[in-house]
A protein has these predicted regions:
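Intrinsically disordered, low-complexity
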Residues: 1-20, 108, 119-123
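Disulfide-stabilized extracellular recognition modules
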Residues: 68-123
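Divalent metal-coordination and catalytic microenvironments
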Residues: 7, 25, 100
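Non-transmembrane alpha-helical segments in soluble domains
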Residues: 4, 26-33, 77-81
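Loop/turn elements at helix/coil->beta-strand transitions in domains of secreted/extracellular proteins
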Residues: 8-10, 57, 62, 96-98, ...
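Short, surface-exposed glycine/acidic/tryptophan-bearing loops
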Residues: 19-71, 90-92
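Short glycine-/small-residue-rich flexible loop motifs, especially phosphate/cofactor-binding loops
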Residues: 4, 49, 87
Length: 123
């Protein structure tokens, strides 16, 4: 909801949740939590585009926001809105879908977040 509220304020169309993108985001959040590393590169993947393709989604473009800390989703989305780079991903006009994933690190306190934004290839 918060992501679409940000987009609406700027005259952009809302995004629809997508199960494939949520799977890609959740897998990446788990990978980051397992390694205790915040990175757009995962084990065995070159980046978000490759991870999204592995789910079967056929992207035209893909963007990703990541974060880690003792925060809930509302705080993470607020921080992404305050960051010009993260906000730019949320505001890409062409994106149509999103998926969010989270994983808790072994310390039981640090939450790793990944949000994937994408648009499918045109047929």
């Amino acid at each position: 909801r918060a992501t679409n509220a940000i987009r609406k304020q700027r005259g952009l169309k809302p995004l629809r949740a997508n199960a494939d993108l949520a799977l890609a985001a959740a897998r990446h959040a788990c990978d980051m939590a397992r390694r205790s590393v915040v990175s757009h590169r995962g084990v065995g993947t070159g980046g978000p585009m490759q991870r999204v393709k592995k789910t079967g989604y056929k992207p035209q473009l893909t963007a990703e926001n990541i974060a880690a800390g003792p925060w809930g989703q509302e705080r993470v989305l607020m921080e992404w809105e305050r960051s010009s780079g993260h906000l730019a991903n949320i505001l890409i006009p062409q994106i149509q879908h999103y998926g969010i994933g989270k994983a808790i690190a072994a310390d039981g306190k640090t939450v790793f977040w990944a949000a994937v934004y994408s648009a499918p290839k045109r047929r």
